[in-house]
Amino acid sequence: MSDTARQQAEREAAASRVMARADRLAALSETADALTRVYLSPEHLQANQLVGQWMQAAGMMVWQDSVGNICGRYEGQQEGAPAVLLGSHLDTVRNAGRYDGMLGVLAAIEVVQRLHQQGRRLAKAIEIVGFGDEEGTRFGITLLGSRGVTGTWPESWLSQCDTDGVSVAQALVNAGLDPARIAHAARHPRDIAAYLELHIEQGPCLEQAGLALGVVEAINGARRLNCRFTGEAGHAGTVPMLHRKDALAAAAEWMVQVENLTRQRGGNLVATVGTLRCAPGAVNVIPGEVQLTLDIRGPQDAPLTALLEELLGQAQAIAGRRQLSFAAEEYYRIAATACDSHLQAVLSEAVVAVQGRSLTLPSGAGHDAIAIAERWPSAMLFVRCLGGVSHHPAESVTAADVGLAIDAFSRAVEKVADA
């Protein structure tokens, strides 16, 4: 068998193994008809056990840390060397797909499996972590697992309860973990040299570009606001059009402005009016008040802030012209997370090697890399998903794309770990 044929066979075998393992993980669900696996549930602990077995088979030392992350280490040429950390999350949203998070953990295991089969050790160790909670489905707190690793887990999180009234502290105890030992999950800055995460794109850009893989430039920052137009309710038949103070008409005008201005700004900025409530909400009454939400995101904070200021200014102008009032309250803010430029370049080089060219794009969704990047240089590799669908049972990737992803990821990891 030629080297090319052998490499192709190895790629196909690795991809097939990842796809089969994703199916096995998908079977670990609290509901039979829809994949749901939340933090510290029996299914999460079963997933940890299974992933730990796969890590061990790939030649790794395996442990579960004090916040419920499953971890593995493949030693470097010198024992105790700093590690290149690979990972993603093993928890899901409700009624989830089977690749969000899991693909990154499984592909990372394949990187180590390949080195183990070849009997190779690199200058740096390689560690893999399957984070216990990225989604925040159970407790409404995101990045629990990765914040455990960075040592940025606030003590107040322990008292947060799920819908059944079970606190994080009690859930840890129920899982055989000790809430008093949370800090033991934190890694010293010198333990880790860099972090690389492989993840499905969760959007349509790679598919539209006809590419299997892309490199993330930044994880979008976000602002979320509760907004309100207040006018004057009135009889739908007796108040002339020129005398109306229609809150819904003002909101509709602003929504079109939100769309148009965001498109004009470009720069991968996005804006969404996701909810709208109209009062009094009767067919024969002019709307007197409209409450709506605004979600805006972008890969750089300054353009995002400028867009928000312009949108709020437009809302005030519309309200003033229509003799209404407008108010907005920001209730959520997260800064953009830039990926490390050197690691981006390494990933781009690896992607070009396997698919001929690369594409740089932002991540509109949050990832564990947000927390990890606060401590260590971090970067992400995206894999195309069918139709950009995610957080849904129809979430899908192809084995061919997974094979390319494993190849590119392996190249990048080896370059970083041997530097």
Where are these regions (language model features)?
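Zn-dependent metallopeptidase/amidohydrolase metal-coordination segment
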Residues: 18-24, 87-88, 358-408
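A short beta-alpha structural unit
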Residues: 36-40, 272-281, 293-295, 299, ...
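Alpha-helical metal-binding/catalytic segments enriched in His/Glu/Asp
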Residues: 86, 95-135, 223-229, 238-261, ...
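His/Asp/Glu-rich mid-to-C-terminal helical/loop segments that flank catalytic regions of hydrolases
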Residues: 219, 235, 239-265, 313, ...
